[in-house]
Amino acid sequence: MSSSQSTSQLKRKQQTISSFFSKKPVAPNGSTTTTPKDGHVKKTIGHARVHEAPSSEMDVVDGAHDAAVRPDEEGDDDYQIILPSRKRIRSNGEVSTLQRGTLADIDNGHSSKGENELQTGIMGSSDSDRAEQPVKIKSGSSRTEKFRFSSSSLPSSSDPKGNGGCDVLYAISADGDASEDGDEEQKRKQALHQKFVKRLGGPDCLPFSVSRVDAGDAEEAEGAESDAEAEAEIVPVPQKGRGGKKTTTGKLTPMERQIIDIKKKHMDTLLVVEVGYKFRFFGEDARVAAKELSIVCIPGKLRFDEHPSEAHLSRFASASIPVHRLHVHVKRLVEAGYKVGVVRQLETAALKAAGENRNAPFVRKLTNLYTKGTYIDDVEGLEESSGNSGSASTSTGYLLCMAESNAKGWGNDEKVHVGIVAVQPATGDVIYDDFEDGFMRSEIEMRLLHIAPCEFLIVGEMSKATEKLVQHLSGSKTNVFGDKIRVERVSKSKTAAAESHSHVSSFYAGRMNAKGTTGDVAASNLLEKVLTLPEDVTICLSSMIKHMSEFGLEYVFDLTKYFQPFSARSHMLLNGNTLTNLEIYQNQTDHTSKGSLFWTLDRTKTRFGQRLLRKWVGRPLLDKTELEERVSAVEELQDPSKTVQIERLKGLLSKIRADLEKSLIRIYYGRCTRPELLTVLQTLQLIADEYVHLKSPADLGFSSPTITTAIAALPAIRDDVVTYLNKINEEAAKKDDKYCFFREVEETDEITESNLGIADVQHRLQEHCAVAAEILGKKKVQYTTVAGIEYLIEVENSPYNLKKVPASWRKISGTKKVSRFHTPEVVQYMRERDQYKEALAAACDKAFHALLADISTKYQSFRDCILALATLDCLLSLANIASQPGYIKPAYTDKTRISVQRGRHPMVEQLLLDTYVPNDIELHTDETRALLVTGPNMGGKSSYVRQVALISIMGQIGSYVPADSATLGMLDAVYTRMGAFDNMLAGESTFMVELSETADILKQATPRSLVILDELGRGTSTHDGVAIAQAVLDYMVRNLRSLTLFITHYQNLSSMAREFPKGELRNVHMKFTESGMDGQDITFLYEVGEGVAHRSYGLNVARLANVPDSVLEVARAKSAELEEKIRKKKMLALAKVAKGFINTDGDAGGPAPALLERVMVGLEQL
């Protein structure tokens, strides 16, 4: 067989190996090939013979890699990348030469005589063979370096055998006679051979199968470079131990060192790290993220302290998410209560390649921190969508800081001084307060329930009672906020007060200097206001400034205009028990907003309107004038004669899709995106344009000053908004195109300079087409783009055309028809263009943030406009409620009075399908100021008293009320003591909690308060319970003179009404009818009637609760027995009174009035 025929046959049989080279392997000079009967090919190279396997056997080893390199051999594949030939492999500074045709045979792993000859052929070939066309390449990555020959495999003078150190593989004599070795030696060779194949046998392990692209090349992608870092981390570099054996190293990769350095500074944070085109979690963070996000976690090291227990692991555990899904997953982690940090790459591939650190890993830094209270990077935030689903938690997004000091007293006499600062980063609102609290911590609880924070920041140590309260409110997802609350703690030094005052002073002085408002009188007054805050509040404010600085949100404290004290007495006080018992913000069943008073009144169309209405509900007005103005506005907004103006307002609100309040504060923080900024400005322009034509308030068509003032504030911002919109390219902003975001006339010098540089490079690239055409001998050459690689020059695959291609041109890709090249000039121009693009991106970002800063100077005027719009939204919501049938406008009086005819429970009425039974109520400080309410269990007593309180609260919010008529006085507070529960954490029984809350009410209530007490005294014996209930009720009526609703099952208390001849205390009961044998069946009428219900009908409730009949029979018998005993005692007592009445001396003027009353009471009870 001729040499040419054998060569073509060899090519067909070695398809997998030929795919690794740009040129087909050619047999060296002097080589001959023969084909024996067994189908194996013997090829002689010099004096060595090569025994090769058929291609079918070779495909088993390398077929997978061949398919990866050449996905479609027969088709015209545009994505086939031609890899350069690799003939020499650098290892430890030396060069070894391998013939192309031999590595495939090594890879096959045959243990035959021909293989022995192969090894001698490799190691024993002449110098002239090794010098044949050497190709040197740079040392590869740690992944490929693992699989390279070491210099020990080359012949050296120190080698006693003179076989080039072939003991590492296996040494064979030049003539290939394997029979000269003994059986033991042959086994040793076989074992060494298998070890070699195991090391070099995988398709991915061939050193020349990995594409080697110079790091300085312009076309090198950023993601590829970053992913290479990840590969380096996943596959560590093995090194030799002392005994020559390979051991796994504990050496960290550069990226691992970066991660550990950042993690050590933020051990309480889940880090998500940008690596190329993915964000990755490492170590324990990966395990947590995989659990919360339901993503895959690749096993590995979990600890970051290089603990010996994980020495057997060579990499960190990891989990990854796509870049475009970052905020989706971050939001889920934040909602789960974690603190999440985003670590980003701070340099791009193009600038990195041109810089001095081109061979170093990407610079990474923690750029964002998020928690529940500080997550504002998503305009949707963590709130539910606008509507009335009522399924979300009632948290408001406040971050509350609390400090406690001066604990004095012990037990029930304990007093603590508390300071709080609560900030809502999404809106810029700041609430502060300073107060003293008792051992029940009712003041703290009230503020926490009102503010409903999503995150606590505790400064220093708390007392046990306060600590237990915080744990109770934040410990689980079933707490009163309906969600788990994050708690962070910071230390408090002994000199905290002085340090905090100094820190706050320097912070605001620095902010004023930066803004240039040092001499501004208004700014100085606001600064004075901040610096005169109480000591504990200042400590909290300082801690909050430091805490928010970690998240880049400290600017929120610049807005001192929006600092509001919590305990301003311009509002009705609703304490924690009242908020819970009356279901102001959430129901008591599943702790959602559905069924609450806020849910009932919420008909708002915007998010910022909904937030304002929530404040209105929790802070009813005390100022009668302000209240009447609000109610008049609500009345005017349902006037049929003004339907056109009202519909115009509703249409304007319905067009607003964005949460303007949140977006505005994001602009202030510099966190706003380009599309979001365009949306905000366009929405503000829409709002301003709606009433820009109006010249005076009279043109509005409304007479209410509340409405006209709010509408007049809308057009005031139009000029500023139009000025900013004129700077923006609308189409580019919609597409988030940073390069064309500004109109051409508004571009900065840096942007213009970068654009000119890019244009110049592109011009030179076009001119280079003519040069390339001249070299190729063509009239015209055009660039093409394939697989994202630009400026490729295509050359047809013919010997005539390919001969014209200079050696300096770099082949990038090709098909069967064409090859694609980059010229050195194109590479240089692309590098310049990428550098200009990076500079352009930086200039565009700088200009955009400068625009946001400019808009921030108008924050207060824009915020006032949004607040005016929110006010209109709330008024329209209340008008919607007022338009429902059965709602009337209440009349207000300066006297402490509640007079309601046919009032109804506002929430139960909406939730019940049946008609709600209305009831009357008449309370007045100078007349009847207390009602003693009795009646059967489940008769509607609690619903009745709640209805009275809710109507009073609704009236002072400014809403219409569900009644036929209502006259309401200005109540300063509503206090409730309802329900039975203990406090095991504080070691307090149900009765203890009941009396403690009652004691707080007796201390705080005033003659202008409404007090509701439900079954006081039931937690102890009957005698003690009656005594306590009677004493408390008497104190409420005689001393406090508060409006009181007292529910009880103690019929003996009804006699107290006779002690108040002017009717200050009156008995009422819930009506019912009896039927059936012995009156066992009763029908609840849910109507309030005069008098006392002398039975509670508890057995009826037991029957409704499906208590077993046998138990009911025993209970019924015992009840009858006890009633009979009591009846006999009363008859005996009445008989004695009657005897005394008969024996009374007629000359004395008849029986005493007290004696007559006792007779009447006895008869009434019987």
From Swiss-Prot:
Query: A Pfam family this protein belongs to?
Result: MutS_V
What are the boundaries of the region Disordered?
1-165
Q: Does the keyword Kinase apply?
A: no
Which SMART domains does this chain map to?
MUTSac (SM00534), MUTSd (SM00533)
Which domain of life does the protein's organism represent?
A: Eukaryota
GO BP: any one term = mismatch repair
Main function: Component of the post-replicative DNA mismatch repair system (MMR). Heterodimerizes with MSH2 to form MutS beta, which binds to DNA mismatches thereby initiating DNA repair. MSH3 provides substrate-binding and substrate specificity to the complex. When bound, the MutS beta heterodimer bends the DNA helix and shields approximately 20 base pairs. Acts mainly to repair insertion-deletion loops (IDLs) from 2 to 13 nucleotides in size, but can also repair base-base and single insertion-deletion mismatches that occur during replication.
Q: Which family, according to UniProt?
A: Belongs to the DNA mismatch repair MutS family. MSH3 subfamily.
Protein name per its UniProtKB record: DNA mismatch repair protein MSH3
Gene coding for it: MSH3
